[in-house]
């Protein structure tokens, strides 16, 4: 996949040709949403990076497919744009979401969802194709899963990514 330069307002941003999905299809949905936002708002990567509180080179690398955003940066993006994470990942057509009255952490939500699950942690780790130690780190709050894993967990629990991430109280 070759990178191209698109000229916007005397600045450049790095991107892939429209229609190509960088990295993988789940992360590609997020990247496509960011790319569309930049195009529709005539915004540069520099301005966008400032808006979400991220380094310009990080955003450029998301757009050219050399890096994937962390879940923390996905949340920062959603917060800065006042959009749902599910909208950024093309899981819903609605950008708006109802913020949680008292936001929860990912680990709190995961604990709550696991309490009604019949499977043990080792089985779930195998189903989710992660190491059991990763699940332990998610549960104790020392690590967040990658965005594509959050997407898959939301599918597994039949809830929104925003609910799983503690951004809304609506599953």
Indicate where each model-derived feature is located.
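A short, Lys/Arg-rich alpha-helix, primarily the initiator
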Residues: 3-43, 94-119
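The alpha-helix within a helix-turn-helix
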Residues: 38, 49, 78, 114, ...
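Residue-level detection of the helix-turn-helix DNA-binding "recognition helix"
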Residues: 39, 53, 64-66, 93, ...
